[in-house]
Amino acid sequence: MPSKLQFYSEFAERTARQITGSYRSWTAFLATAARLYKYPYNEQLMIYAQRPNATACAEYDFWKDRMGRYVQRGSTGIALIDTSGYQPRLRYVFDVADTAPRDAARSFTLWEMRAEHEAKVCSMLTEQYDVPQDGGIIAQFERVADKLALEYWTEQKRDICGIVADSFLNGYDEDNIRMAFKTAASTSITYALMARCGFSPDGYFEPEDFMPVFDFNTPAAVSVLGTAVSEISQRVLRQIEITVKRQERERRAERTEEHGEQPDLQDQRRISGPRPEPARESA
């Protein structure tokens, strides 16, 4: 009988083989990964496989000690494979939906990018990545994703070219591998940014936009692609988070100063329904 570690290792490998098998599978993974953007790819994969609708995950002690929340009876932890030590081991996290607040619990909210944040986010993206603002924020997301995907390829192309064996990339020359990787990564990053920032990427992209993703059809190949998408998305989303939260703090401070109101600690709401996005520009 396999150990739990072996069971979950094989489970992760099966999931990795499946997620690039179709447009729906890959974008479903991206939607989960976008919500859990602070986790690395391998842990995003495990969370997606066990709890695809998870929104915010943390270990038991974090919920109990830092947030003043308790894990509800009967909740099942999400198993993650921890490779940070000398030997792999399992650790478990719980989604916020598995928890409930104690009397002295800290307020728990997820940041949300709303229409009033877009101007500052656009300015931040221009400053950080030297991309123009014309065409709106979705066009900016695409430009940032294109730029960072190409930078990632330049830095990691030896490793990327080293995983083509047994995948549909096998037989491609370096230039075609570069094109496949850049397109797959850039499209996926843009999808993740849109999903986390409240837009509807499924209404923006066509399944054909993800065709290069399907070439990454082995665990090693999807790991390279997934790691790139995860690392780049995390970098950009952390900067967006900082920008949004800073604007909210400034707005609350102004309200308090002008009207003598107490800061609204609950103003950052959970993400509601996605906002409509601008029409996609034709090529």
Residue ranges and their predicted role:
Residues 1-283:
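N-terminal accessory/interface modules of nucleic-acid-binding and processing proteins
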